[in-house]
A protein has these predicted regions:
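Positively charged n-region of N-terminal signal peptides that target proteins for export
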Residues: 1-4
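Bacterial N-terminal signal peptides
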Residues: 6-16
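Short, low-complexity N-terminal intrinsically disordered segments enriched in polar/charged residues
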Residues: 21-70, 179-184
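Short beta-strand edge/turn micro-motifs at domain boundaries
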Residues: 22-27, 145-174
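A short gly/proline-enriched turn/hairpin at secondary-structure junctions
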Residues: 36, 56, 76-90
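Hydrophobic pocket/interface hotspot
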Residues: 51, 68, 76, 128, ...
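Surface-exposed, charged secondary-structure patches
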Residues: 77-78, 87-141
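A mature extracytoplasmic/lumenal domain signature
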Residues: 82, 130-132, 148, 165-166
């Protein structure tokens, strides 16, 4: 999910350091602070729907990063696991780093849709395995599939996403059948 873009790793007290030897993204995207939409944060379904809604859209459509930010705890970490030069590498970002590094790519047209979900919950914590497929245009061919692993917690008033980690399906790492059945659980 939140994919294939330059990534910075934030090192506390040291500022931004390049994770993969590439120059940092040069475009900073200002993200306003707004109140969350009640429907987004009231249920796990609302949270996951918002997760996908925010990053999806046609070419030229600005993404609603302010809405996106309302879904996450302040110290959230996004981790994408990618294959680079035959090696698995994590790309670790906070929300601002993700926005700065992916906004331009998403503005070229990107749609991600959940095709299966497994949710496990224990009291105020939940884990969601969300299988997705991506397209450049809303009804275009599937360009990628993968799984988002999303950790959430309930604070008594609303849900929060604490972490998100994802990876794309590859020939050597196909999505297991249990994450592809036709119904969400």
């Amino acid at each position: 999910m939140r994919k294939n873009v330059q990534v910075l790793v934030f090192l506390a007290g040291l500022g931004a350091t390049i994770a993969n030897g590439e120059p940092p993204a040069t475009k900073h995207v200002d993200v306003a602070s707004i109140a969350p939409r009640p429907d987004d944060v009231a249920t796990i379904d609302g949270m996951i729907q918002a997760w996908y809604d925010v990053i999806s859209g046609p070419a030229g459509k600005a993404r609603d990063w302010a809405r996106d930010r309302t879904l996450y705890i302040p110290n959230l970490r996004f981790v994408s696991v990618e294959v680079e030069n035959g090696q698995l590498r994590p790309r670790i970002r906070d929300h601002q780093e993700y926005v700065d590094s992916s906004d331009a790519a998403l503005m070229k047209g990107f749609f991600e849709k959940e095709i299966h979900r497994v949710t496990e919950r224990f009291g105020p914590i939940a884990h969601v395995w969300s299988t997705y497929e991506s397209r450049v245009t809303e009804n275009g061919p599937v360009t990628a599939r993968g799984i988002n692993s999303i950790e959430l917690f309930w604070d008594g008033k609303r849900w929060w996403i604490a972490n998100g980690i994802w990876t794309e399906e590859t020939r050597d790492n196909p999505i297991p059948r249990k994450y592809l059945s036709s119904s969400k659980s």
